[in-house]
């Protein structure tokens, strides 16, 4: 009996410790990719993106080590009510050395409270920095609806026929035409706080296994007292989105139509900008002080249309497929817009449940509104892959690859500069008038990719 009494407090203590550890368990999620590559003509791996496009086909075409490390925890729960704390720190380096220092990006720090409002069961209120309901095309790493940033909102309000979400976020624009110049201190400039107000209605049943999501985003400059917008900067804009998702073939197809105006056209994903983001100009104030507005051309007034179809499906036990097709037209009053269309496929053949071969073929074509010239590029990658499962989404994965790219460009390339600016054909400013010409290249290497 004495032995039993001695063991009982110990057992209770151990059990309590285990239960406490479970209750306080920290969730660890994230994403990472890294590898090594070479270029056929010599040197480290090059990556290929057509000048003027906002993205590139990514398989065998990523030249950096990148990671997002997420730590989160449910810190309080009572019945169906709870608070969850979430964080995310991101890192990116050039993968050229053992020791590569970098400043981390603190991308998320937010608290989400579920079922806290009695008369809105199922809803979540939140505040802080957050990846907010992002919509993207994985195979080209393209985010077409993304208002992420510091903000607050309420989501998943059940209306019976769909779920309503409301949010406000901020995306500060530094050093450009949305920068204010002080009316009182002429040598002082200030970054611009651009606010976005987002309304989404999701889960609208349209057909068997098909749902519709509708969204409206309004972005504007939030001016600081005593400062003014640079002359010609776009003050605000709208973006409208309709996305239909069809569940099919053990996967999905998404069809998207978007329209944006003025400040919402530069990034085209729901965040406001007051400029087109390509050039630079210097303003000389009355006292002789010169202020350089770097990497911006003011006045992105105009509109943008985007039609997008993408998905991932299974074509039987041995085949999976990713695909994308998109047309985008940015028509600006300053004549520096672009017309971009892209199409690509990534079939996967599964030799075993953990080994596969992938082939990615992608084509981009971008027309300069100013010059009327076109840049085009196609990229082909063949990869042998070992992954944790038999799906095209299975990760972690280790792959060896060979990539071939061929391009023919006639506008907008800055040698040794930022060759992905879609507004680089600013011939009236005397910059960005060259092109990559007509050439090709191939690369090969190995890469790991993981999310968890």
Swiss-Prot record:
Signal peptide: 1-25
Periplasmic topology ranges: 26, 79-80, 116-122, 160-161, 206-209, 249-250, 316-317, 352-353, 389-395, 452
Coiled-coil annotated residue ranges, if any: none
Chain ranges on the Extracellular side, renumbered to this chain: 36-64, 94-104, 131-148, 174-191, 223-234, 264-300, 334-336, 370-372, 411-436
Induction text: By maltose.
Gene Ontology MF terms in the entry: maltodextrin transmembrane transporter activity; maltose transporting porin activity
Subcellular localization: Cell outer membrane
Residues spanning the membrane: 27-35, 65-78, 81-93, 105-115, 123-130, 149-159, 162-173, 192-205, 210-222, 235-248, 251-263, 301-315, 318-333, 337-351, 354-369, 373-388, 396-410, 437-451
Family label: Belongs to the porin LamB (TC 1.B.3) family.
Name of the featured protein: Maltoporin
Organism of origin: Salmonella typhi
């Amino acid at each position: 009996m004495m032995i039993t009494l001695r063991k009982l407090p110990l057992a209770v203590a151990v059990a309590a410790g285990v239960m406490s550890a479970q209750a306080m368990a920290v969730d660890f999620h994230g994403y990472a990719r890294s590898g090594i590559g070479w270029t056929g003509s010599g040197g480290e791996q090059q990556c290929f993106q057509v000048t003027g496009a906002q993205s590139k086909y990514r398989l065998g075409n990523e030249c950096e080590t990148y990671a997002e490390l997420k730590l989160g925890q449910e810190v309080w729960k009572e019945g169906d009510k709870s608070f969850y704390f979430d964080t995310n720190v991101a890192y990116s380096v050039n993968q050229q050395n053992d020791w590569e220092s970098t400043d981390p990006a603190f991308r998320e720090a937010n608290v989400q409270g579920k079922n806290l409002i009695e008369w809105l069961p199922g809803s979540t209120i939140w505040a802080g920095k957050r990846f907010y309901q992002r919509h993207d095309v994985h195979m080209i790493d393209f985010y077409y609806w993304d208002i992420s940033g510091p903000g607050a909102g309420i989501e998943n309000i059940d209306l019976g026929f769909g779920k309503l979400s409301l949010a406000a976020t901020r995306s500060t624009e530094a050093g450009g035409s949305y920068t204010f110049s002080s009316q009182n201190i002429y040598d002082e400039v200030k970054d611009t706080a651009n606010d976005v107000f987002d309304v989404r209605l999701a889960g609208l049943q349209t057909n068997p296994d098909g749902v519709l999501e509708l969204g409206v985003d309004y972005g504007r400059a939030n001016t600081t007292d005593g400062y003014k917008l640079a002359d010609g900067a776009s003050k605000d804009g709208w973006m409208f989105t309709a996305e239909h998702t069809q569940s099919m073939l053990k996967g999905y197809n998404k069809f998207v139509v978007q329209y944006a105006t003025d400040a919402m056209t530069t990034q085209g994903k729901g965040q406001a900008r007051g400029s087109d983001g390509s050039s630079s100009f210097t303003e000389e104030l009355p006292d002789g002080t010169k202020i350089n507005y770097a990497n911006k051309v003011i006045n992105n007034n105009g509109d943008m249309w985007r039609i997008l179809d993408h998905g991932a499906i299974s074509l039987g036990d041995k085949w999976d497929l990713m695909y994308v097709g998109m047309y985008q037209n940015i028509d600006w009053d300053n004549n520096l817009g672009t017309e971009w269309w892209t199409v690509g496929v990534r079939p996967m053949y599964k030799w075993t449940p953990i080994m596969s071969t992938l082939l990615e073929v992608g084509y981009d074509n971008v027309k300069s509104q100013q010059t009327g010239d076109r840049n085009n590029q196609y990229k082909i990658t063949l990869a042998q892959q070992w992954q944790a499962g038999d799906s095209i989404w299975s990760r972690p994965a280790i792959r060896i690859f060979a990539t071939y790219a061929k391009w023919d460009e006639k506008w907008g390339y800055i040698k040794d500069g930022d060759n992905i600016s879609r507004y680089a054909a600013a011939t009236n400013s005397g910059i960005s008038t060259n092109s990559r010409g007509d050439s090709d290249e191939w690369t090969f290497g190995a890469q790991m990719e993981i999310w968890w």
